[in-house]
């Protein structure tokens, strides 16, 4: 008599998990308003971590170091000493902005 030894295996291979494969969402940091751009009071100028750019005239700093305009005007980025920068907002007539 003929004996058969039949052995069945799984047709899906077991796969181990990886410890990689995760990342945090981008925080969308950076300059939001360009030099010479007209802004309204409350507009965000720069989103940053730490004070890479310091607040200048008519610019406030939020709790997360975000710089924002305190008045309507034109944005100006300036040097503050040798290695620092500051953002300022200077008032301007609305007619001058519309003419441009």
Curated annotation (Swiss-Prot):
Keyword field: Ribonucleoprotein, Ribosomal protein
GO cellular component: cytosolic large ribosomal subunit
UniProt PTM: The N-terminus is cleaved by ribosomal processing cysteine protease Prp.
Regions crossing the membrane: none
UniProt key word Ribonucleoprotein: yes
Pfam families in alphabetical order: Ribosomal_L27
Gene3D superfamilies (alphabetical): 2.40.50.100
The keyword Ribosomal protein is assigned to this record: yes
Biological processes annotated in GO: translation
Molecular function terms from GO: structural constituent of ribosome
Chain residues in the propeptide: 1-9
PANTHER family from the UniProt entry: LARGE RIBOSOMAL SUBUNIT PROTEIN BL27M, RIBOSOMAL PROTEIN L27
NCBIfam families xref list: L27
Record-stated family: Belongs to the bacterial ribosomal protein bL27 family.
This protein's name: Large ribosomal subunit protein bL27
């Amino acid at each position: 008599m003929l004996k058969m030894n039949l052995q069945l295996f799984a047709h899906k291979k077991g796969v181990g998990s990886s410890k990689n494969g995760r990342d945090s969402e981008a925080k969308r940091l950076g300059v939001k308003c360009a030099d010479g751009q007209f802004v309204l009071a409350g507009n965000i100028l720069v989103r940053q971590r730490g004070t890479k750019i310091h607040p200048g005239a008519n610019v406030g700093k939020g709790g997360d170091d975000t710089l924002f305009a305190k008045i309507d005007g034109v944005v100006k980025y300036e040097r503050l000493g040798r290695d620092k920068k500051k953002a300022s907002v200077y008032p301007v007539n609305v007619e001058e902005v519309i003419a441009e």
